[in-house]
């Protein structure tokens, strides 16, 4: 166990690894790219990321496309393209909710769990998103809450949804 000082000077909310020594770290005040060297973290300036002023709630790094998908509290979801060094905004406004989790659905799509707008699906290449699983209050046999805490996809491709306050929905 090695305790490191927090060079980010902010509460760390999410971590994604890029390679053996580089990481993205989300905080309650923004996002940083860091390098682990000699058992210390060094901040690596990346201008597009350094400008993000948002509470980061969830991160997902897609190795093949070299894109970091960033979920925030009340600022929506967007992607950072490492190769082009630019931020790409999603077409769907998710700025009223917290992005609780970002998980891969398949080779080209991610699921975005929100606290208030159900689950959205986003294409990793185009960053176009759409509602995917939302509650239906008219039926008792469907998901009955749009407040999603977590999602998990098992080997059989079933989607497990931890929704508040009801518990688990499996689709």
Outline where the language-model segments fall.
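Carboxylate-rich, polar loop motifs that coordinate divalent cations or form catalytic acidic clusters
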Residues: 1-171
